[in-house]
Structures are given as C-alpha cells and as structure tokens.
Amino acid sequence: MTKTIVVKIGTSSLTQPETGQLALSTIATLAETLSYLRQQGNQVILVSSGAVGVGCARLGLTERPKAIALKQAVAAVGQGRLMRVYDDLFTTLQQPIAQVLLTRSDLVQRSRYLNVYNTFRELLALGVIPVVNENDTVAVDELKFGDNDTLSALVASLVEADWLFLLTDVDRLYSADPRSVPDARPISLVTSIKELADLQVQTGSQGSQWGTGGMMTKISAARIAIAAGVRTVITQGRYPRNIEKIIQGELIGTHFQPQPEPTSARKRWIAYGLVPTGKLYLDSGAIAAIVKAGKSLLPAGVKTVAGEFEPQDAVQLLDPQGNEIARGLVNYSSKDLQQICGRHSKEISTILGYVGAETVIHRDNLVLT
C-alpha cells in the first residue's frame, strides 16, 4: 500500500561536526534510500536543514551567526550549494526533485495554506521528491518556524502523511541527554500525549553547534504530527537505511503512536498553522466546559486578556498557571473583550453598544492542544 513519508534531516546529520562541511556519504545514502522508497510507489518529502551550516563552511565562518541579516545572507550562500548536491545525487538515481522554500506566513493565510497543499499534491503526483526548507533569507522573527522539526511536522500534517521521520544525532529519545548523562533511560515507544507529558523528559534544548533544533523541538513536532494521525519516529540520521527497516516493522528509535481520531485539517491549521497574537486566561469552570464537554468559550469564563488582537485572530487559551489548554479564533478584539470578560453573554450588547456573538470562541473554531 502506498504511503506518504516525510523525512526531516538536521544539520548535525548533514554536516561533519568538526568542520561543518557536508557529510557526503550520509547524504548519498539518504538519496538512495528515498529514491528506493519512491520506486516502491511511496510518496516522499524531504525536509532538509543545513543551509546556514553549509553557508558557514563555504564562507569560512567558525560558528553559526547570531545577527539576523548575516544569518540570512549565509543561508542564501548555503542553500544553493545544498540543493546542487541533492540534485547531483538524485539525478544519478533518475529521481527528480524540487526545491520548496516556505515561510510561516505561507501557512498563516488560509488561501496560501491551501495553495501550498495543492503544490505538494501536484509534485507528489508527478513522482517528484520535494526538498523543503524554511526560506531563511526572507523570514522574519515574528513569522519563523524556528526550526525544521516544527516545519516538517506542519508539512506532514498538511499532506496527511503516514510517517514522519526526524533524523537526528542520537539514536532515540532518552530520559536525559545521553551525551552528558551516561545512564539515561532509552524510550522506545510513546503511546499518547499524556504519556509524553508524564515522562517529564529532561532533554537538552540547545541543539548542535551548527543547527537550531534540540530534542525538545522534536517532542513538540511529534505532538503536532500525531494529532494529525502521523506516526512519528526519532532516529539516528547517520543511518538513513533504518527508515526502510522501520517501515517494515523493526522498532528502531523512538516511535510516537498517532492519535486514533486525527484532528480535522481546519482545526490543525488553527492550532499549528496560525501564530497566536493574544492569550486568554480562563477560570476552572470554562476549562472544564471546553476540555470535558467540548463547549464554546463564553465571556463569563475569561479572567484575563493579554496581548492585542482583532476578531478572527488566533489566541491561546491558558489555565491560571499559564499552561496552554487550547487555541481558537476569537470573535472579539482584545479591546472589546477586556470590557466583557467575566460577564454574562446577555450583557454584551449593553456593555459594547452593539449585538455581537454570544461566544468568545465558538467550539467549531476551538481546538485542544
């Protein structure tokens, strides 16, 4: 049966740790593996980091730049080199590829989100392997994915993939960073988000010298992907052939089981495609109504409003301790909501001077996170 497979490979797997130069043998094996999967009738997407790391090596820089303008310039240098290597390797295997550069704003606007989906659909139908990266050269901080783990999970969610492989510099998830804690406990299978939270995994968030994605970003990416029904695996990037073995049933790496009832595409867009512009702190009654009964959010349940937003913007819903429980599209601006929070819906027209929605966020526009 044909599968849709998204593979993300990080800078730490693509480059030599000492020099930042491309690890050509790893990339060649990756190209062979992905081409083989395509020949078996699967649809394959590669999300590749490495543009900044390769650019650093090309320009003789000894560490990843911190200044945004310099980093964007270095990414422009590295992206061309990276794609040339991919194109040369895949061409020898008679496998066409396509470069797809995305920014967060491509997923924020619903129309552009659907356009991206349609582009992927056409490329996959043509038998092409899209090679995806964040468009670091033009991305701004407010609208960045931040790391390609998140980007790969959003792409996997968008195309409703069957598998997401996060290739990294460790062989699986551990209870602590095995590079600094030798007796860290390996974790082979995570069956639910609750189990993931209960593990309280003490992982490093620093990432490698040349990359941006630590283990915490991979856990966050897994959360996004399994909500979309995508089975997610964290495994060693130096051994791309393990992808074939895992698909055939071997339990290599850490597996995250997908949710049995995936969230709808529109709600996934609300939860993960949009960038929240505000926060609503809720009382315990509102939290119970949303989480346990699937109700809409009413103004009476809102205790505090933070941030500035307009109607139909995305906001985070938080408990009194600041833990996120949901996201949604709000029916009122922050200015109006500050006036009606804590009040009954029947008082809205009197307070605001116009007849608005009874709900702050309707349940159709609300998704638990």
From Swiss-Prot:
One of its GO terms (cellular component) is cytosol. Pfam families: AA_kinase, PUA. GO terms for molecular function: ATP binding; glutamate 5-kinase activity; RNA binding. The gene is proB. It is found in: Cytoplasm. It comes from Trichormus variabilis (strain ATCC 29413 / PCC 7937) (Anabaena variabilis). Residues 277-355 form the PUA domain. It comes from the Bacteria. Pathway: Amino-acid biosynthesis; L-proline biosynthesis; L-glutamate 5-semialdehyde from L-glutamate: step 1/2. This is Glutamate 5-kinase.
